Every structure is written in structure tokens, then in C-alpha cells.
Regions:
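Active-site helix of classical SDR
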Residues: 151, 186
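Substrate-binding pocket helix/loop in short-chain dehydrogenase/reductase
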Residues: 127-138
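Conserved glycine-rich cofactor-binding loop
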Residues: 43-44
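C-terminal helical subdomain
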Residues: 210, 230-266
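Residue(s) in the substrate-gating loop at a strand-loop-helix junction
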Residues: 170
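Conserved glycine-rich Rossmann-like NAD(P)H-binding loop of the short-chain dehydrogenase/reductase
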Residues: 57-74
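Conserved NAD(P)H cofactor-binding loop of Rossmann-fold oxidoreductase domains
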Residues: 119-124
Length: 290
């Protein structure tokens, strides 16, 4: 999707000079007037609910996703509830320069991040060797490369503002995933990367949390091509509740948030089973979803 730059604000070129000192412009001082929370993948599902929760708790938002119309509708909804209208940045995180475009849009608005929520992600159902290779690499672009880029690109702002980073993983990241191999592997990366960043950012006062939900009834299921009706027992935590738990977990600086009792026990239970057994069980589960 073609990204349309936000209109840049004209900034006065005021300058200061004293006792022969070199002139310094306001632009060089780079005064930032407002802090915002950037949420990726905000146009649907958990991303939309996260936007609602953050806005309800007084955060000014910047929203990004591919679908500009949905972002605008959400921004108008949140503004109608009394908050300041979120900044809307329509772009596709599969594009290699998406991070640069987002950073430029935020700079043009004169804002800086105090929270970053890397929610965007997708998967496709079916054996990796049978699916389109470009499609599979696209999963890595969004779920891994873009998340890494934004986390590192804005780390200095999170440090400066003593903010927080919420990366959306999945309980799938604790498992091997035949039938959704690239997606499962991408979420394993998210968990490992986020836990490592947590240790690195802790001395700087930045909260870092990874959200690991199970299957949630959102548009993700349809896009992934997962058959309907097979996840009913696990679809017990609505997206809105997932978002509420994620927000509370981030504010409490929890290492990980796993919504739902059945999901919470997964990482613990896996310790007691051989890896081969887990692989076979996951493979059977995925075949049942066809």
C-alpha cells in the first residue's frame, strides 16, 4: 500500500545569539511537545482493542496499519470519547522502509514515543513447503523484521521517556508448529527477543512485556485460512479482555502475559514432555484444524 506522508507542521526558525555565541535554531534544539503510544496493526482485532484500552487510560495514540479507512474510523471513535484524535499512519510493514516512514511521520507531528506496542503480525495455515515462498517470507518481514526495527529504532525515545514496550507474541512461540511453521517460529523469536530486550532496558527504567495469547476470535483466523470450529475450546478470552490484561501487565512490568488459565499453564507443562512428543501433538492439532 502506498504511504501518504502526513502534512509537516511549519516550525518557526527562531534563533538565539548571546555574546558572539553561535546561532542555535529551534529546529536544532528539537523540542518535542508531546509523548504518544504507537500501536501497529491497529485496524482490527487485538490491535484495535489495545488502542481502546490505552486511550481509555489517557494515552495519546499514533496508529498504523495497512487500511487507512479503518484507522480513520478508529481514530474518530476514540476522539469522540473525549480524547485527542490519534495520529493515523497508513503503511504496510512488509515494506522495507516502513520504519523510516513511521519515524518521519511522527517527527513531522512533533511527537516522541513513550510507549511502543508491536502488535502487527500474521500467519498462513498449511505446510511451509507447499505455500508460496514470498508469502512465507512476508510473515518474517512483518512478525520479525518490522518488530525488531521499530523496537530498536525507538528504544532511545523509550529510554528518554521512561516508557514501555509491549511486543505481541503468541503461545505458539513456545511450540514447534508444523502446519504453520514460519508463524510459530516467528513468535518464538518475538518471545526470545523481547525477554532479552527486557534485561537490556531494565537499567534504563523501561518496562518490557511480551503478550502471548492463544487463539483469539479475530480476523487473524480468516486471513490465516484456519478452518472454523476447531479452536472453540481455546477461544475463551475475547480480544478486549486480552487487551485489558496486556495493558495491566505492561504497567506492572510483567515479563509475560498469557491470557486465560489454559494458556498460562502451557510453558510450564511443556517442561514435562519430550520434544518429540510435543512435535507430534502439535502436528495432530494442526491437521485437525484443516
Amino acid at each position: 500500500m502506498r504511504w501518504t506522508p502526513l502534512a509537516c507542521r511549519a516550525r518557526p526558525m527562531l534563533s538565539f545569539q548571546h555574546c558572539g555565541a553561535k546561532k542555535t535554531s529551534i529546529q536544532e534544539i528539537s523540542i518535542v511537545t508531546e509523548r504518544v503510544t504507537l500501536i501497529t496493526g491497529a485496524s482490527a482485532g487485538i490491535g484495535t482493542e489495545l488502542a481502546r484500552v490505552f486511550a481509555a487510560n489517557g494515552h495519546r495514540l499514533a496508529l498504523t496499519a495497512r487500511r487507512a479507512d479503518r484507522l480513520e474510523a478508529l481514530a474518530n471513535e476514540l476522539a469522540a470519547k473525549g480524547g485527542k484524535k490519534p495520529i493515523v499512519i497508513a503503511c504496510d510493514l512488509e515494506d522495507a522502509d516502513a520504519g523510516e516512514k513511521i519515524a518521519a511521520a511522527l517527527a513531522a507531528e512533533g511527537v516522541e514515543l513513550d510507549h511502543l506496542v508491536n502488535n502487527a503480525g500474521f500467519g498462513v495455515f498449511g505446510d511451509a513447503i507447499e505455500r508460496d515462498r514470498v508469502e512465507q517470507v512476508g510473515i518474517v518481514d512483518v512478525n520479525v523484521r518490522a518488530l525488531t526495527d521499530l523496537s530498536l529504532r525507538f528504544a532511545d525515545q523509550l529510554i528518554r521517556n521512561k516508557g514501555g514496550l509491549l511486543n505481541v507474541g503468541s503461545v505458539a512461540g513456545y511450540l514447534p508448529g508444523p502446519g504453520m511453521a514460519v508463524y510459530y517460529a516467528s513468535k518464538a523469536y518475538v518471545i526470545s527477543f523481547t525477554e532479552a530486550l527486557r534485561a537490556e532496558l531494565a537499567p534504563h527504567g523501561v518496562r518490557v512485556t511480551v503478550l502471548c495469547p492463544g487463539p483469539v476470535p479475530t480476523e487473524f483466523q480468516a486471513r490465516a485460512g484456519v478452518g472454523s470450529g476447531h479452536d472453540t475450546a481455546l477461544l475463551n478470552v475475547p480480544a478486549a479482555e486480552v487487551a485489558r490484561q496486556a495493558y495491566r501487565g505492561l504497567m506492572a512490568n510483567k515479563r509475560a502475559v498469557l491470557p486465560g488459565l489454559g494458556i498460562k499453564i502451557v510453558p510450564f507443562a511443556l517442561r514435562f514432555f519430550p520434544r518429540g512428543f510435543i512435535l507430534s501433538a502439535t502436528s495432530r492439532f494442526q491437521r485437525q484444524r484443516r
